[in-house]
Amino acid sequence: MNLLEHMGKAAKQASWQLAMLSTAKKNQALAVIANLLESESQTILQANERDMAAARESGMSEALLDRLLLTPARLAAIANDVRQVCRLNDPVGRVIDGSLLDSGLKLERRRVPLGVIGVIYEARPNVTIDVASLCLKTGNAVILRGGKETHHTNQATVNVIQRALEQCGLPAAAVQAIESPDRQLVNELLRLDRYVDMLIPRGGASLHKLCREQSTIPVITGGIGVCHTFVDENADFEKALLVIENAKIQRPSACNSLETLLVHQAVAKTFLPLLSARMHAFGVTLHASPLAMPYLADGKAKVVAVEAADYDDEWLSLDLNVDIVTDIDAAIDHIREHGTSHSDAILTRSLSHAEYFVRAVDSSAVYVNASTRFTDGGQFGLGAEVAVSTQKLHARGPMGLDALTTYKWIGYGDDLVRS
């Protein structure tokens, strides 16, 4: 039995114990984790500094460096997120529905943990805590495989989690991390279907492709966010600029940040110079289509010609594609062609246009007069999220607690036999 099989077997055994825990016991473990994250913050931050130094030396982009960075404020926020998970309702054991059948069998459908979840992610140290806390709350064990960029941070964080579990009399194997950077171990994890019940990749398109093609475990894909906002012909310009500013500027490296702005041709001449001035204030580079370039070339913001491939990639930086479309249908066609089914928005004062857009755009989250940045487990009231799914089975959008459960049928009889 190799390393991964040992980890898988230990995780499966831990999952049986977790599935039997009361909500109070799970919350106790989460509270201890949150407290230890704070008391051991210097150890975790020092580990993160080692990862940051190595990442800078390797030439990592600013966007990825921002994802990798932990600050005292970010770590404190992560600890508070764990406490928020404590306050969330536990879905495990909840009766979804039930009925008394003509046969006399009392039948109910009850939420239960999935079992063991595998998560593969890249330069996102917060994922370690987010995933672990949600899995523990739902009675699932988890095997984590972070990128080599987060090696020291993940090691320190998982050590804190396992110490907390042991303090609460729970198996440390409930949260395990693959520490070796050997990529062959990823391939082995993808085939560990004897022990792992669901796999969630959080990373770039190549990672998602690898998991879809090689995994023998059910895979939940998503998190790649080529997010769009369409400025309709009757949008309120000043309010639209505030939404665009938030969607692009607040955290450009996030998967729910705005990447492509589509503007109705009827308002392009007036709106685009205003956009240029607003984006200039934040150092945004505009990547303009041939139609948009005449209205942006003399503006304040830096502008370059958009490349065809730009429409299909996440910038994750202070860059924004800008194009002009003839009408709402052209905007929808563009989103269907280049979107990733993550988060897309319309800015409009027309109720009929808003409803048409919502029905036509097949994304996991669609917004009317709101920023795409809202696609987040915390913002949706789900607590920390394990991922944002852009597929339709078994979960869609930010994956909170319910998405980490399945259900079982339970039948109650009085020595009942089938006739």
Curated annotation (Swiss-Prot):
Coiled coil: none
Pathway per the UniProt entry: Amino-acid biosynthesis; L-proline biosynthesis; L-glutamate 5-semialdehyde from L-glutamate: step 2/2
Keywords, sorted A to Z: Amino-acid biosynthesis, Cytoplasm, NADP, Oxidoreductase, Proline biosynthesis
Classification via Gene3D superfamilies: Aldehyde Dehydrogenase, Chain A, domain 1, Aldehyde Dehydrogenase, Chain A, domain 2
GO BP annotation list: L-proline biosynthetic process
Main localization, broad class: cytoplasm
Annotated function: Catalyzes the NADPH-dependent reduction of L-glutamate 5-phosphate into L-glutamate 5-semialdehyde and phosphate. The product spontaneously undergoes cyclization to form 1-pyrroline-5-carboxylate.
Protein name stated in the entry: Gamma-glutamyl phosphate reductase
UniProt source species: Yersinia pseudotuberculosis serotype O:1b (strain IP 31758)
Organism lineage: Bacteria, Pseudomonadati, Pseudomonadota, Gammaproteobacteria, Enterobacterales
